[in-house]
């Protein structure tokens, strides 16, 4: 009984601390890729490994003309945002994070949590177990994925498959990903770990 009370106290304390997020945007373990995509082709990109304690991920996609360059990187934009609560889940937040520069070309993309499904989609267009599907062609996009997303379930990477919407010319895509690391979860104290510990306590009660 005492063991159970101690565990519940620790859990309660962690929930109280979670009310005021404290962490950082990891500007070292980011993904920053410039992709040249052939006309009508697909290409898979694996993100850099997410650090332990990643609870949110921001990604940005910018399709550029040959002579265009990104004016401000996603890392530099996020410096003005102290934590993910400052990013709106609505269109306003997406517009703020999205690049101010974009070209005329567009692409579609799908996000997977494992390489096998991503490769199958890239090679044969068989769509299975995707956590984000963007079927409407876009020329720029910026999104926040939270720990509640199907995309973030303790996995270290995400796999993005981009598909060109241009059937004549190749296109250039700048792809950026920045993880948010929560100090409380850096030592592996995640929601999944909490559930597992509670389950063990209930079994032994």
Feature names for model-found ranges:
Residues 19-205:
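Acidic, Ser/Thr/Pro
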Residues 1-22:
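Bacterial Sec-dependent N-terminal signal peptides
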């Amino acid at each position: 009984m005492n063991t159970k009370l101690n565990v519940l106290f620790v859990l309660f304390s962690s929930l109280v601390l979670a009310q005021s997020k404290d962490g950082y945007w990891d500007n070292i373990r980011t993904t920053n890729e410039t992709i040249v995509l052939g006309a009508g082709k697909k290409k898979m990109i694996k993100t850099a490994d997410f650090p332990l304690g990643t609870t949110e991920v921001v990604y940005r996609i910018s399709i550029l003309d040959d002579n265009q360059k990104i004016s401000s990187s996603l890392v530099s934009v996020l410096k003005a945002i102290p934590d993910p609560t400052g990013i709106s889940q609505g269109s306003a937040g997406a517009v703020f994070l999205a690049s101010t520069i974009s070209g005329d070309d567009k692409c579609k993309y799908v996000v997977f949590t494992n390489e096998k499904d991503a490769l199958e989609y890239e090679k044969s267009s068989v769509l299975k177990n995707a956590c984000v599907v963007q079927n409407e062609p876009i020329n720029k996009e910026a999104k926040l994925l939270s720990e509640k997303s199907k995309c973030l379930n303790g996995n270290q990477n995400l796999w993005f498959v981009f598909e060109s919407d241009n059937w004549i010319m190749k296109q250039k895509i700048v792809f950026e990903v920045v993880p948010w690391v929560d100090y409380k979860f850096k030592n592996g104290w995640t929601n999944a770990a909490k559930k597992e510990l509670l389950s063990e306590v209930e079994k032994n009660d």
